[in-house]
Amino acid sequence: DNIIKTHPDFNTFAGASVQIPKTVVLCTDVFDQFMEQNNLYQIALSDASDDEILRHFLHAQLPDSLIADFFTFFEAVKCPIAIRSSSLLEDAHYQPFAGIYSTYMIPYLEDKYAMLEMLACAIKGVYASVYYKDSKAYMAATSNVIDQEKMAVILQEVVGKQYDGRYYPNISGVLRSLNYYPIGDERAEDGIASLALGLVKYIVDGGQ
């Protein structure tokens, strides 16, 4: 948002509007509460398979206090919703975790209770992905300690268009809170974004 405000030239493109999609963040305290109230650390830190860990997480309960907020978000967003990870380690300088954890997308439905069920499953799936075998292996390879990882979750409208019954995102990207190579009047704390047409897999996989 700061970059958009300080670069008015973003608004000079005919037929295009550059703005931040509607977004809700579930902070790390929700993750802590979910893990502790459902006693999930034992299975999460075990050698259980990814499927077994996911099964336990899907059977767990999210805090009831979130339900009203989810319905409010559904009223504000009339398109599919991306459910993305936002962990403490994903913005690390030398060992970023971007692309390690799961991301989900749910469709927009008139049945808001069906959306609520899908959203809850997606959030639990993001939480579970912290403890999958690939995540643990990457954690060990980068000399990080898994029980110190904290997970926030971002709920964000997917801006795009529908073609032949399928919904396609316009542009996706990876945001970094620090830009280590600022140019001109830019500051490191302004951050930087890597953008690509469609889904962000191209960038996360190392595309330039």
Where are these regions (language model features)?
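Conserved mixed alpha/beta core segments that line enzyme active sites in large multi-domain catalysts
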Residues: 1-12, 61-208
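A conserved helix-loop-beta module that forms one wall/lid of the active-site cleft
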Residues: 1-46, 50-64
